[in-house]
Amino acid sequence: MDTIFAEATPPGRGGVSVVRLSGPKAHATLESLAGPVATPRMAALRALRDGDDLIDRALVIWFAEGHSFTGEEVAELHLHGAPVIASRLSQALLARGLRRAEAGEFTKRAFLNGRIDLAEAEGLADLLSAETEAQRKLAMRATEGELGRKADELRSKLIRAGALIEASIDFADEEVPDEVPEEALDLIKAVRSDIQGMLASYPATERLRQGYEVAIIGPPNAGKSTLLNRIGQREIALVSEIAGTTRDILELHTDLRGLPVTFLDTAGLRESSDPVEAMGVARAVQRAAEADLRIHLSVDGVPEETLVLGDIIVRSKADLGRGEETAISGLTGEGVAELLDLVYDRLRVRAADSGLVGHKRQAEALQRAVAALAIDDSLAPEFLAEALRQAAQALAMMVGRVGAEDYLDEIFSSFCIGK
């Protein structure tokens, strides 16, 4: 196994730069640069030298094999944050036979060495890309191994049910028993119900992980772009009295009280002889249909498009008068805070339905498991036992206990180099 290294901190100038090593030569390499560092898991200030060249004075620490994140020998060198120092250290490490780590290779080694399961690795990737508090909390549940523990619990029940069925076959007076033990059937029903519940929460979990989209739709000159600018508190969209100014969909990524929300400013909905504007309108209609929530904005408060349950109808340009409760003014800000309250309340309800399964790969594994368990209770015991084995294997694959090879490159390539 190669010993690898990479900067664990972002490249560029900063207060501190951390270089991480992992592999069988990590400790020996550290001592070749810093002198004896005998005590693991204890930081020490050392001069780093490559021959007669003093590279830097750094805080160093190492972890013994089996007691590190990767499961291998690991060393960390906390340097001063000038890029030239990390570059000079890299030269010294390459000269000692180490190689630069690939993206996500430290985490991949942690998985291969049994330090984390695949769901925890996916959770770590989500944590590193989290932009809001809700996403952070969701990712932390995954990194703490909740999904892996749930999968193991369900597998244990299936294994118990399978053992009861196998025992009924092995010790039956007849060649093949006619009935499946009642305890086994109860366990199968309980597992099937749990998996169906996990699958039911997948869409909400996936949306929270990816972020919600809220489309602002309505006729031309309804104030959609002005509203987007007001929400973003900066000029994002060009505002003009000329109808049809907005043609492309403009996006505003926001943290709405911990929820990841992207507001979409769309082209004004109308029939147009201008082919470019017509394309913009068509895209607006499609994107609005795909959005999680729609704000129907118009001067008269009458929506242009068919309503979907949960949509919000708002009369714009409240600064012009008429003082209705559902009116807003993107120009003055009147009613915008109340509108954002309403958007948050709508999305918060959906976020509350989130669970443990937030990745397509995980959901597909659960679908295979529940399909294997979609069996008639009157099925012959030997066939039922085989169905249980298939379901248990699908659960094991969900967290990478078996058959994870096809997913490794895709999952770990999303990490940064030093993770």
Swiss-Prot record:
Q: Which cofactor does it need?
A: K(+)
Tell me which residues bind Mg(2+): 225, 246
The source's superkingdom equals Bacteria
- The EC number on file is 3.6.-.-
Q: Where does (6S)-5-formyl-5,6,7,8-tetrahydrofolate bind?
A: 20, 76, 115, 419
Q: Which keywords, in A-to-Z order, does the entry hold?
A: Cytoplasm, GTP-binding, Hydrolase, Magnesium, Metal-binding, Nucleotide-binding, Potassium, tRNA processing
Positions binding K(+) in this chain are 221, 240, 242, 245
Q: How does it assemble?
A: Homodimer. Heterotetramer of two MnmE and two MnmG subunits.
This chain's function reads:
Exhibits a very high intrinsic GTPase hydrolysis rate. Involved in the addition of a carboxymethylaminomethyl (cmnm) group at the wobble position (U34) of certain tRNAs, forming tRNA-cmnm(5)s(2)U34.
Name this polypeptide is given:
tRNA modification GTPase MnmE
Its ancestry begins with: Bacteria, Pseudomonadati, Pseudomonadota, Alphaproteobacteria, Rhodobacterales
UniProt gene name: mnmE
